[in-house]
Amino acid sequence: MKKKKLFLGTIISCVVLALSACGSSDNVVTSKVGNITEKELSKELRQKYGESTLYQMVLSKALLDKYKVSDEEAKKQVEEAKDKMGDNFKSTLEQVGLKNEDELKEKMKPEIAFEKAIKATVTEKDVKDNYKPEMKVSHILVKDEKTAKEVKEKVNNGEDFAALAKQYSEDTGSKEQGGEITGFAPGQTVKEFEEAAYKLDAGQVSEPVKTTYGYHIIKVTDKKELKPFDEVKDSIRKDIEQQRLQDTTGKWKQQVVNELLKDADIKVNDKEFKNTFEFLEKK
């Protein structure tokens, strides 16, 4: 899904660039109610899409200047796009004014470079900070401390944790599974929760832990032995890379953009677009 979105974003840019290249008085449309010239169309596109297109063009140059993308890498992405779009692939190329797959490869290179840039944000420290044992974790989330203490007391008295989660937990995503958090891993929960969870051994239950969501009673149901760092460091790095590529907050994408464009020493000579990169001055 992600790569399909990238592909569609690329071809939309192609449409804008192709149409805004027009500038003559030739008619694009004739009708009884009036004609539309290429110059009029070009002006309209420039006003509506010029700033965003200029931004994308400069960003693409900055990306490809720092992160090189080979023809083979681009070809692989094109093949994946063909598989996803099926019979619509060829007609889509024609619609956006691309003559062949080679032209599309060039248009997709900045997107590939962007992925490389985000992956490059992962440091050795990030990998070491995520070097933690695999665990299965369950929790019961309640709104107030009083309820949290009452539920913890029930756990201490031997009541079933999963049953209590179904009865009390406010977390609709886990309560019906007895509080089990699917795919618990470093960086996927708030700091207070994560720190408390990793301090527990298998079978242990925490005291109430306060976070922005409320109060959690955390139980570690399984905790595997930590493997040697050299055996798992590559896997850890790949996991972090995927988390950042899929990050819905846009944090890592914006970090990459800000750093690249600041280093690019951009000067806009066209008054109409003088504010395109003003956000960099505020950082």
From Swiss-Prot:
Its main location: membrane. Disulfide bonds: none annotated. Keywords: Cell membrane, Isomerase, Lipoprotein, Membrane, Palmitate, Rotamase, Signal. It is an enzyme of class 5 (isomerase). It comes from the Bacteria. It is a lipid-anchor. It is found in: Cell membrane. Its EC number is 5.2.1.8. It holds the Pfam family Rotamase_3. It catalyses: [protein]-peptidylproline (omega=180) = [protein]-peptidylproline (omega=0). SUPFAM superfamilies: FKBP-like (SSF54534), Triger factor/SurA peptide-binding domain-like (SSF109998). GO terms for cellular component: plasma membrane. A lipid is attached at residue 22 (S-diacylglycerol cysteine). Belongs to the PrsA family. PANTHER family: FOLDASE PROTEIN PRSA, PEPTIDYLPROLYL ISOMERASE. HAMAP family: Foldase_PrsA. Plays a major role in protein secretion by helping the post-translocational extracellular folding of several secreted proteins. Important for the secretion of the protective antigen. The three PsrA proteins in this organism show different but overlapping substrate specificities. This is Foldase protein PrsA 3. It comes from Bacillus anthracis. The gene is prsA3.
